[in-house]
Amino acid sequence: WTWGEKYIQLRQDPKATIPQKVGMLNGTGWAAYANGDHLFIKRFYSNPDAMFPDFGCNVEIFTNANMLEVESLSPLTTLDPGGTLTHEEEWSLHRGTTMGNSDDDIDQGISSLL
């Protein structure tokens, strides 16, 4: 874990014995996962006035020894019988990125990709 002023970083560790999970209301509408020089960015709906599940979270990050998951959540919605709901995400994968550990490093590495 690294807690910056702007970003929270959770690292996947293949030696981890205890799973880790964090959830939050993310007003920026994106979350990212860096692996080597590859960067996965997930964009999603963000409305701080909407009601979200899991104590108001619109994004959750989970990791254990095998994986790291970046999950976005839809606002709570009441559907009529037979109704439908669509939750959209936009994914992008970038190669040749350099991500440091400080908030400034992250800003520099990701700002042109958002």
Where are these regions (language model features)?
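A contiguous, surface-exposed recognition patch within enzymatic or periplasmic domains that forms
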Residues: 1-86, 101-109
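Short, hydrophobic/aromatic-enriched beta-strand segments in well-ordered soluble domains
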Residues: 83-96
